[in-house]
């Protein structure tokens, strides 16, 4: 690659000021009181390591094999063959593998794709990525680097392997044309005078390569790669959809599995696979997955049951229920029944039949983001890339200006009002809409009778503070974290009512917040004396947090776990050698209930 850029003083900032600029060295920012709370829970040094890890993606992808359609060995060899067919210099969907003279190619493939080393997870493969890479951002000696600035959520998706899509672009250098090489940086929220946070860049902003550019200093150390502009600057800010930049060099290189072995594999975070295994569903049982979208854990449970029995999957969003059914169909699973139902209303209060009708109206198919319970982003412009469990919210960036829409007919152009734009963005957030699905109908449920399930998985909506990569965390306050915890307790109350005596409840979250994890376990054990913590298999994570913490000027004490209880739960630390997301799992045995 070419040497680092040396822009002239007349056209760009002085070279000395750019020292270390074109790097990726993010620093995760928190609300001060939240940071103090986590530092008290983890210890200051450990929390600093966790914050550092959260700002970077894992260096591998975790693949769960559908063992009802294939085997781990067969899938492993199929993936190796794909690497061989594409050539070692290309890898799977763009993952670069450097071939060295005289080196055995089978060694390269074997080092890329490996079996999961943890006992009880024989159906899991790891595909290695790489990073962080030090990139050289090219420019002509007398010119500044052409740049595109993207939103934080867009950047988080790019770090996981996505391309840059149009809705994620905030600013662009002047005179960028299709085919130009551009550096991609990210605009992260900054503190504002009222005590809140804001990006502070209007969509469509022009970059001149000067220190006066928007977020010039703030973007130092926040360059995530470079690529080729797929359209001109004017095109990027004129259309609503499409790829804006094809990424050619990335700080982190992770494999993409779009359209690879569909139905045979599912890309899923390791702790999510573990949670389904810990539930230990048996063939013939009736299982409830209370917050099931997008269906990763649901299908994992069905496969563990050998597709024998019944797995009931719930979500309150029409489109997400359709996603669950679509995934079950791809994996040839017949025991899954998915219903549109808010998990907070999952216990029936009447003697009516469980199924009360079909959600077939347009207004029920298109809902606002507030109806969606998934906590974290993974797609850009509605394009799923490396879709993982717990991650399905579409990332969009709304402009303050009307868009000029360019139709297929180049002579046809029209302006779109902000009202119409907001409507389109809501649809993008919630997927393609019921009318674009085959069938298009989902069953609605009025709830289920108490004690009607053998096992219940509650993968609760949460603050999602364990997901990686995360470039900003300042939106969460102590009050909002406590609100999440109250909501989860209500959902857990429903789970307790639905599981039969002698059954099992598994509770999990993708957050590092002890208030949503250990404090929930404390609430459960203190409130329901017939519940007891159970040992877990497989056991990959570490112990829980012991003790308590005083909050809100010592007006509230949050109680956590005892030493013995902490050994029975699993807490996944993003900074640990497992190199996965922050996650928590607790398993409860249900004894004889009180009348």
Please place each PLM-identified region on the residue numbering.
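Glycine-rich nucleotide cofactor-binding entry segment
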Residues: 2-304, 314, 318, 322, ...
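Conserved SAM-binding strand-loop segment of SAM-dependent methyltransferases
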Residues: 333-343, 437-438
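Short glycine-aspartate micro-motif
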Residues: 287, 311, 457
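Intrinsically disordered, low-complexity regions enriched in proline, serine, glycine
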Residues: 74-75, 193-196, 336-337, 468-469, ...
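Short, conserved SAM-binding segment of the class I
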Residues: 327, 490-495
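Short, conserved active-site loop motifs that form the nucleotide-linked donor/cofactor pocket
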Residues: 264-265, 336, 531, 569
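Short glycine-dipeptide loop
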Residues: 284, 307-309, 499-505
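C-terminal catalytic and target-recognition region of SAM-dependent MTase-like enzymes
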Residues: 100-106, 344-473, 477-481, 485, ...
């Amino acid at each position: 690659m070419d040497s680092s850029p040396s822009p002239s003083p007349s056209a760009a900032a002085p070279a000395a000021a750019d020292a270390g600029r074109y790097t990726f060295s993010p620093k995760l920012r928190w609300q001060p009181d939240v940071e103090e709370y986590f530092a008290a829970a983890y210890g200051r040094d450990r929390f600093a390591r966790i914050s550092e890890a959260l700002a970077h993606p894992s260096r591998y992808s975790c693949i769960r094999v559908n063992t009802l359609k294939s085997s781990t060995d067969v899938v492993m060899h199929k993936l190796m063959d794909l690497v061989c067919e594409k050539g070692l210099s290309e890898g799977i969907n763009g993952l670069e593998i450097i071939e060295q003279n005289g080196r055995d190619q089978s060694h390269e493939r074997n080092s890329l794709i490996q079996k999961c080393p943890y006992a009880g997870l024989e159906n899991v493969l790891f595909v290695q990525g790489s990073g962080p890479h030090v990139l050289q951002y090219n420019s002509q000696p007398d010119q500044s680097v052409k740049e595109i600035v993207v939103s934080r959520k867009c950047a988080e998706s790019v770090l996981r392997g996505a391309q840059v899509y149009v809705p994620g672009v905030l600013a662009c250098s002047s005179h960028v044309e299709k085919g130009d090489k551009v550096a991609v940086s990210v605009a992260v929220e900054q503190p504002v005078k009222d005590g809140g946070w804001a990006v502070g860049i209007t969509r469509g902003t022009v970059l001149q390569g000067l220190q006066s550019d928007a977020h010039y200093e703030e973007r130092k150390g926040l360059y995530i790669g470079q690529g080729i502009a797929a359209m001109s600057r004017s095109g990027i800010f004129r259309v609503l959809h499409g790829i804006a930049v094809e990424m050619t060099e990335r700080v982190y290189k992770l494999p993409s599995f779009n359209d690879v072995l569909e139905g045979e594999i599912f890309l899923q975070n390791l702790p999510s696979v573990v949670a389904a295994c810990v539930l230990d569903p048996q063939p013939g049982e009736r299982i409830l997955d209370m917050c099931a979208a997008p269906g990763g854990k649901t299908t994992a449970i069905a496969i563990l049951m050998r597709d024998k029995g019944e797995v009931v999957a719930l979500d309150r969003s029409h489109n997400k229920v359709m996603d669950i059914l679509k995934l079950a169909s791809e994996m040839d699973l017949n025991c899954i029944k998915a219903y549109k139902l808010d998990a907070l209303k999952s216990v029936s209060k009447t003697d009516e039949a469980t199924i009360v009708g079909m959600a077939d109206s347009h207004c029920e198919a298109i809902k606002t983001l507030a109806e969606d319970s998934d906590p974290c982003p993974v797609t850009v412009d509605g394009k799923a890339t490396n879709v993982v469990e717990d991650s399905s919210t579409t990332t969009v960036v709304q402009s303050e200006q009307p868009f000029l829409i360019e139709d297929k007919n180049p002579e046809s152009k029209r302006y779109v009002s902000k009202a119409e734009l907001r409507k389109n963005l809501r649809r993008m957030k919630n997927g393609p809409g019921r009318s674009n699905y085959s069938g298009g109908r989902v069953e609605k449920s009025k709830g289920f009778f108490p004690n009607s399930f053998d096992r219940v998985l509650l993968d609760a909506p949460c603050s999602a503070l364990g997901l990686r990569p995360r470039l900003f965390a300042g939106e969460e306050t102590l009050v909002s974290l406590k609100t999440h915890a109250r909501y989860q307790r209500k959902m857990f109350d429903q789970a307790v009512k639905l599981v039969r005596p002698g059954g099992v409840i598994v509770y999990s979250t993708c957050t590092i917040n002890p208030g949503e994890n250990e404090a929930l376990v404390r609430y459960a054990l203190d409130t329901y004396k017939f519940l007891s913590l159970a040992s877990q298999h497989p056991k990959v994570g570490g112990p829980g947090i012991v003790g308590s913490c005083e909050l809100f000027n010592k007006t509230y004490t949050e109680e956590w776990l005892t030493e013995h209880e902490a050994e029975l739960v699993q807490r996944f630390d993003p900074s640990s050698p497992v190199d996965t997301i922050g996650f928590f799992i607790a398993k409860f045995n249900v004894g004889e209930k009180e009348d």
